From Swiss-Prot:
Belongs to the peptidase T1A family. One of its GO terms (molecular function) is threonine-type endopeptidase activity. This is Proteasome subunit alpha. One of its GO terms (cellular component) is cytoplasm. CDD domains: proteasome_alpha_archeal (cd03756). Transmembrane segments: none annotated. It comes from Methanococcus maripaludis (strain C7 / ATCC BAA-1331). InterPro entries: Ntn_hydrolases_N, Proteasome_alpha, Proteasome_alpha-type, Proteasome_asu_arc, Proteasome_asu_N, Proteasome_sua/b. The 20S proteasome core is composed of 14 alpha and 14 beta subunits that assemble into four stacked heptameric rings, resulting in a barrel-shaped structure. The two inner rings, each composed of seven catalytic beta subunits, are sandwiched by two outer rings, each composed of seven alpha subunits. The catalytic chamber with the active sites is on the inside of the barrel. Has a gated structure, the ends of the cylinder being occluded by the N-termini of the alpha-subunits. Is capped at one or both ends by the proteasome regulatory ATPase, PAN. It is found in: Cytoplasm. The lineage of its organism: Archaea, Methanobacteriati, Methanobacteriota, Methanomada group, Methanococci. SMART domains: Proteasome_A_N.
Length: 259
């Protein structure tokens, strides 16, 4: 875990810049995201995929009550990592913005427009006294009238569009997997397998009941939550692939030792 540099008093208010031009409260908010659950988003040729490891810490928790992927509109879905309460506030605001757009303009809001509105809210909370930044990152994705879109929002209000990305504690490992395995021509089914493969590398054991997953396909342009049974099938396929890779690596190592 990256150590935070002493702030020398410049972290006492959100509106104070350090001599290096840093806003420490924003950096602390990013630290909350780095400690959050891992979420993966992948843009495919026929849709988009979101998957989150809900990281259940107790057998007494009702898994169905832990939600990490939220439907914003018929065609937009979002995954969160960071402070749960902050997520609830921004998700409610995102849903409100989507409905206001339908009422005002008679059409669905685009993924980019919604992402920008959420980032405007996040940015406002970095420059007003008496408030703090949202300790939360969002992956906002969906299908609009243009194409599949996938955006990542930062606690500072920064907005970046990706082909595939990850947020949360497992981001570094998941990004390595995505950078090496991602293919722009992969299907949604292949994207679901890659998303779970990336998550499997960030945890000791990938349990289907702990995974939250949703897709939006070009054909229907509607958010679809993936069932636990379907996730279980994909997880089994992922672990078969992992076992095959480990066997191949062991074989190659043995051949090198012989040489």
């Amino acid at each position: 875990m990256q150590q935070m540099v002493p702030a020398s008093g410049y972290d006492r208010a959100i509106t104070i810049f350090s001599p290096e031009g840093r806003l420490y409260q924003v950096e602390y908010a990013r630290e909350a995201v780095r400690r959050g659950t891992t979420a993966v988003g992948i843009k495919c040729k026929d849709g988009v995929v979101l998957a989150v490891d809900r990281r259940i810490t107790s057998k007494l928790i009702d898994v169905s009550s832990i939600e990490k992927i939220f439907q914003i509109d018929d065609h937009i879905v979002a995954a969160t990592s960071g402070l749960v309460a902050d997520a609830r506030v921004l998700i409610d605001r995102a849903r409100l913005e989507a409905q206001m757009n339908r009422i005002s303009y008679g059409e669905a809001i685009t993924v980019e427009a919604l992402a920008k509105k959420i980032c405007d809210i996040k940015q406002a909370y970095t420059q007003h006294g008496g408030a703090r930044p949202f300790g939360l990152a969002l992956l906002i994705t969906g299908i609009d009238r243009h194409s599949a879109r996938l955006f990542e929002t930062d606690p500072s209000g920064a907005l970046i569009e990706y082909k595939a990305t990850a947020i949360g504690s497992g981001r570094p490992i998941a990004m390595e997997v995505l950078e090496s395995k991602y293919d722009e021509n992969m299907t949604v089914n292949e994207g679901m397998e890659l998303a779970l493969y990336a998550l499997s590398k960030t945890t000791e054991e990938l349990k289907p009941e702990n995974i939250d997953m949703a897709i939006v396909k070009d054909s229907g342009k509607l958010v679809e939550k993936i069932s636990v049974d379907e996730i279980e099938k994909i997880v089994k396929a992922v672990y078969k692939k992992v076992e095959a890779e480990e066997a191949e690596a062991e074989k190659n190592k043995g051949e090198e030792d012989i040489e």
